[in-house]
Amino acid sequence: TLISDISSKAIGQSISIVAHSMGGLVVRDTMRLHWDNWNQFISRKDSRVILLGTPWMGSHLIMQVFTGHLSRVRQLNLLDTHHTKEELIRVFNAYPGLYDLLPVPKGSDSFETPEFWEQINSELNSDKIQIPPLLDYFKKYKNEIQSFKPNLDNLYYLAGKDDLTTCAYRIRKTIFGKKLQYLGTPEGDGSVTWSLGIPKNLPAERIYFAHNTEHGNLANDEKLFEGIRDLLT
């Protein structure tokens, strides 16, 4: 693995990782799939891992991709004159990495079951929401993440802040019929809620908040650089 290669070359040196968003899931999978290499790395003197807005246990925003409600999906649909929105969603649904971003905590929605998606269509009296084809893959992945007990030694989390972050959904009655509505919480960075992003059991003294920086700018906001540098030293 890359981390073992770097570790073998950086003899006697500390190694630190700053991972933004999904990069933190690469860190988590390195922990999970290369446990021995990870423990050798993180036990090095002064080694650190800083996660910037990582969706550690997923993001509710991803359901909006599958249902076609995410603003980026709608924008792509406007720009792409050769494919319908349904065709675009069918392309997105084929990428396993997208499923890796769905919420996975115990007690979360049963995204891994066809019945979950069928129920939404039933309540909307519609068939527009596609049943994602890789649900078996996601079910296996979800079970693996739920059973994984990570080593959080020397790991820090920097959470951003935005006005609202998608945290749930509901079926709402309107004069035009029933509509799928997404709900937001102020406790999030615009893409990832704090409750899903911040790893459970991470000590409070290793959790930091950037109250004026949203998700996409956590690695770009120069006002944060000095604080990140301090955590690395």
Residue spans of the language-model regions?
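Hydrolases whose catalytic domains are alpha/beta-hydrolase-1, hotdog thioesterase
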Residues: 26-30
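Helical cap/lid subdomain of alpha/beta-hydrolase-fold lipid enzymes
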Residues: 32-233
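Short coil/turn segments at beta-strand junctions that form active-site/ligand-binding loops
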Residues: 11-15, 153-154
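Gly/Ala-rich beta-loop-alpha elbow adjacent to hydrolase catalytic centers
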Residues: 19-23
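Hydrophobic beta-strand residues of extracellular immunoglobulin-like
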Residues: 24-25, 156
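Glycine- and acidic
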Residues: 15-16, 210
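Active-site catalytic motif of lipid deacylating hydrolases and related acyltransferases
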Residues: 1-13
